[in-house]
Amino acid sequence: MEASWLENRWARPLHLALVFCLALVLMQAVKLYLRRQRLLRDLRPFPGPTAHWLLGHQKFLQEDNMEKLDEIVKEYPCAFPCWVGPFQAFFYIYDPDYAKIFLSRTDPKTQYLHQLMTPFLGRGLLNLDGPRWFQHRCLLTPAFHQDILKPCVDMMAHSVNMMLDKWEKTWTTQETTIEVFEHINLMTLDIIMKCAFGQETNCQINGTYESYVKATFELGEIISSRLYNFWHHHDIIFKLSPKGHCFQELGKVIHQCTEKIIQDRKKTLKDQVNQDDTQTSQNFLDIVLSAQAGDEKAFSDADLRSEVNTFMWAGHDASAASISWLLYCLALNPEHQDRCRTEIRSILGDGSSITWEQLDEIPYTTMCIKETLRLIPPIPSISRELSKPLTLPDGHSLPAGMTVVLSIWGLHHNPAVWKDPKVFDPLRFTKENSEQRHPCAFLPFSSGPRNCIGQQFAMLELKVAIALTLLRFRVAADLTRPPAFSSHTVLRPKHGIYLHLKKLPEC
């Protein structure tokens, strides 16, 4: 009798709990079903490749195969809907007129993508929106003024020559073929540490910050994998997965490096004040620290760490990829490499000194840089979440809430925009050809109010790196080990870039 009474006492609450759980599951299922039906309705006017009912276009997205995207761009020359699983869809665009309308608006960054990046980058320029983004943008813009960038030329040249000295030793003692991306990655990190944070780390020699470089690479892989794996869209499932655990540990490495940079610079500035040794110019970190000192409520410690994280990551990773791909393109096209070298020698001589003004006098080399950025854009896409409906040039509309992805790769390889888009042709960027082209046909640094704040710094770095390298070496591609693309947020070489080096005689 007593057991029966206990069973009856507990049966009702258990039944209620079970019914409640089933109701929650049913509500979630209905919500997902309605979401899918809404997306199907909104995207019905737009043709695209057939998607698997469960996986969507996941296989294509995870193949690191840009050729597949090229095929889609040929077949659908303006845009196409891209499904990530059954309940999430992006709208890809790669037409200049579509891009112009898209970039002229003030839609916020895609929340989901930047939620993935916030745990290790924080809330900096890359993923802020609205008044906070505007405040940070206004604050940081002076850090990229010409007067701040001019002294960076010597620091960049020093870092590049340090890398080239390593190559020269390798050339005299080993085979002439080396993997250059690893070296260039450390070199661009060295440049950022000097120019943006005022620190001499010798990371190219002593291996300092190798853990940071490794962490950024692995984090990029995890973020890209999670973005296109709808099973990992749920935070709890992702955190319980091996990749989720790895993500947390790698984030700690990033934060430790950032905190050390900030504290070291604070100490240096404090010592300078104590010694009455005030520096004449400020770097990126000095400007941010000054802003925080002026109003800690307006610019918190978290804001400070976020901006240092953002600039350190974006400033070295994308630059390293761009320089590596530039060398590879010139290695494949020796006639353009020779013409660049001749131009550089006529301006720089032996390269023992290099100035801001001289870098404005190498137009053909600049055209080769731009053609590389067209052929292999370091940031292959950018995304926004529509805050209000978007009417496209063909008259069709997308509703608020839709995620729109501007595929810069697709735009730069669109045969409706560029003749023979796979051919390396720097003459596309002569003044005459550039004036005849749609202003939104070439967007390596995006455009509009949210364009890349560091694009002038990046171009300066590319010019210094390629000028000094071509003065000392002739490069040729190792055709037995062609590079592959890695579909991170930055378009890096998946297994590095192998080049044959030939030391040139001194002028």
Curated annotation (Swiss-Prot):
Alphabetical list of Pfam families matching this protein: p450 (PF00067)
Principal subcellular localization: endoplasmic reticulum
Reactions performed catalytically: N-(5Z,8Z,11Z,14Z-eicosatetraenoyl)-ethanolamine + reduced [NADPH--hemoprotein reductase] + O2 = N-(14,15-epoxy-5Z,8Z,11Z-eicosatrienoyl)-ethanolamine + oxidized [NADPH--hemoprotein reductase] + H2O + H(+)
GO cellular component, one term: endoplasmic reticulum membrane
Localization, UniProt: Endoplasmic reticulum membrane; Microsome membrane
EC id: 1.14.14.-
Protein name, entry field: Cytochrome P450 4X1
UniProt organism field: Rattus norvegicus
